[in-house]
Amino acid sequence: MPAQIDIADARFAYDGEHEVLHGVNLQIEEGSYVVILGHNGSGKSTLARTMNALIVPDEGSVSACDLSSADPDEQIEIRRHVGMVFQNPDNQMVTSIVADDVAFGPENLGIAQSEIVRRVDEALEAVAMTEYAQADPTELSGGQKQRVSIAGMLAMNPDVLVFDEPCAMLDPRGRRGVRRVMRSLNERGMTIVHITHFMEDALDADVVHVMDKGNIVLSGTPDEVFAHGDLLRSLGLEQPFAMRLAHALRARGIDVTDTARLPELEEQICRLAGIDAEKGE
């Protein structure tokens, strides 16, 4: 199966001198859930912007949905297929009513009003924000605002959604809500690319790529990637809390196995203690 997004030897420098991307190669398959991890300055957000032609590499190539970002005539079409959700939802709010904000993109495409209404209704339902359709976006929580931003992208009917640090400004509850939306969209068949520095965000992924200094330095499933604790720490990243806790327990002689998922670790501990994890007794 050909890649839905194909990045080949991509190089890019903002000032024409200091490269941010150093020959990156990445293929993203249709319907996959991909997480790109990295500390600030690793190049992950720049890479994300190449996926919908907001940035065109100085060298190498990027194709999305069989369209080339190097062709100016195809760049707008790429952005219809590949939507982006950014870190600060306030920067994507353009009206004083939630439903109107979601409708803004389709209206600019000249779509018929009846179709816009249908898309807005479906998009708000997909992010569990239907009851806020007539609300003022400025009165919503950070997590709710981000879900409205996602709805605005969904109303454009993209094939791929790229999330660039969408949870960076949210509290844990808001982060969980946005992650639930991303999982739900992926379960419906949409390709999800999540750019993040939160380790727990990567647990939902099919594939995780770790970036450092403009290169992808590690790839694999979440469990495969998080098994490289020493490498992650050298890159300024940490293993998920559950895996760090498992290591600490083993150091104290408690026989648990590595897992990045807290519920799995809780089940192991309960089993060792002779406790029914579901009943708590």
Residue ranges of predicted features:
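The feature captures the beta-strand-to-loop junction immediately N-terminal to the Walker
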Residues: 37-39
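Helix-to-loop junction immediately C-terminal to a conserved catalytic motif
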Residues: 52
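Conserved ABC transporter NBD signature motif
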Residues: 60-70, 78
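Conserved ABC ATPase "signature" region
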Residues: 114-132
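Conserved ABC ATPase signature
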Residues: 136-140, 144
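Catalytic Walker B motif of ABC-type/P-loop ATPase nucleotide-binding domains
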Residues: 161-164
